[in-house]
Amino acid sequence: MGLRARDIVLSTVAAESLLRLEQSPDPASRSIARRVRSLRSILLADCLHGEVVKKDRIPKALKDKHGLENLFVEDLPSFWRLLYTIVRDRGERYIVVVEIADHRVYDRWSPGRSR
């Protein structure tokens, strides 16, 4: 049994990305959106499911934009990534999805760490 979270919240940026993916006529985009939706139950049951990004490796741009103290990454179809953080409020854990990004955007945040 994993570390449970009370709820998942999408940042404005992540919500806009998900909406664009869901409304796209491209089947690959809809596949990415379906995977994001299917991760909900997995992440609620185990908020540590994603790959941990070490504190010193959290991209400064994301740290500054979202005020991150921790960051986790879930791989999505077509080399997209779902980036989330875990926050606590009144003793409860919440997952905040900060970004849903394609590999070009993700690689820009982490220069020098290409595949």
Language model features with spans:
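Basic, Lys/Arg-enriched alpha-helical interface segments
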Residues: 1-80, 87-115
